[in-house]
């Protein structure tokens, strides 16, 4: 049978423990605050890299049992102007909620765009979505972004400064934006194109 410590013995052990230093507690709290601030700062820096532009907001109606239910649909283009861009669609009962969902959806559908040293695209490319067809081609430095509507927004947020774009077919902003995304997703650098075709860069240019 083991002897259990009495209440007086426990009290004497507690009395022998060194007193806690309030400075140590403050240091621990400051360290935790610094870690939280660093995490918050890094998240804010990542968010500040991205820009979003609303292409279109429209009211949509859904027929339900009690009548028609109205909501808002927002088409948003998200990009960091460094070769990444995405198009998102959000629906909600209010405009702010629809835009927020559109931004989140756009970040889930990002496309990487290979940029040339003069902030253009390496080759000509075509894209199609529904009845919309988009043709984009590289341009010389100083040309600017020759495009309109949602196509221009996509190209600018991708970081392209010199490009020519032509819209064929549908004028719907969503279809044109998605067609531009398809065209950008098909772009390849000269080096990757020569590697895929199994030829040298000199043969590619000749």
From Swiss-Prot:
Domain (S5 DRBM) ranges: 50-113
Compositional bias of kind Polar residues: 1-14
Keywords attached to this entry: Ribonucleoprotein, Ribosomal protein, RNA-binding, rRNA-binding
GO biological process: translation
Stretches the record annotates as Disordered: 1-51
GO CC field: small ribosomal subunit
GO molecular function terms listed in the Swiss-Prot or TrEMBL record: rRNA binding; structural constituent of ribosome
InterPro entries (UniProt xref): Ribosomal_Su5_D2-typ_SF, Ribosomal_uS5, Ribosomal_uS5_bac-type, Ribosomal_uS5_C, Ribosomal_uS5_N, Ribosomal_uS5_N_CS, Ribsml_uS5_D2-typ_fold_subgr
Family: Belongs to the universal ribosomal protein uS5 family.
Function: With S4 and S12 plays an important role in translational accuracy. Located at the back of the 30S subunit body where it stabilizes the conformation of the head with respect to the body.
Complex formation: Part of the 30S ribosomal subunit. Contacts proteins S4 and S8.
Domain remarks in the Swiss-Prot or TrEMBL record: The N-terminal domain interacts with the head of the 30S subunit; the C-terminal domain interacts with the body and contacts protein S4. The interaction surface between S4 and S5 is involved in control of translational fidelity.
Name of the protein in its database record: Small ribosomal subunit protein uS5
Organism placement in taxonomy: Bacteria, Bacillati, Cyanobacteriota, Cyanophyceae, Synechococcales
């Amino acid at each position: 049978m083991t002897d259990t410590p009495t209440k007086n013995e426990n009290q004497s052990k507690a009395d022998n423990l060194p007193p806690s230093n309030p400075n140590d507690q403050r240091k621990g709290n400051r360290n935790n605050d610094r870690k939280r601030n660093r995490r918050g700062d890094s998240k804010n820096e990542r968010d500040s890299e991205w820009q979003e532009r609303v292409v279109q907001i429209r009211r949509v109606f859904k027929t339900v049992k009690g009548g028609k239910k109205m909501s808002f649909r927002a088409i948003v283009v998200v990009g960091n102007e460094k070769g990444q861009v995405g198009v998102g669609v959000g629906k909600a009962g209010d405009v702010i909620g629809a835009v927020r969902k559109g931004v989140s959806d756009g970040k889930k559908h990002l496309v990487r765009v290979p940029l040339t040293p003069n902030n253009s695209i390496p080759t000509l490319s075509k894209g199609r979505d529904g009845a919309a067809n988009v043709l984009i081609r590289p341009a010389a430095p100083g040309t600017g972004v020759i495009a309109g509507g949602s196509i221009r927004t996509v190209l600018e947020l991708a970081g392209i400064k010199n490009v020519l774009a032509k819209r064929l077919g549908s004028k719907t902003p969503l279809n044109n934006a998605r067609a531009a995304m398809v065209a950008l997703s098909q772009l390849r650098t000269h080096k990757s194109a020569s590697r895929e075709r199994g030829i040298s860069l000199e043969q590619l240019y000749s």
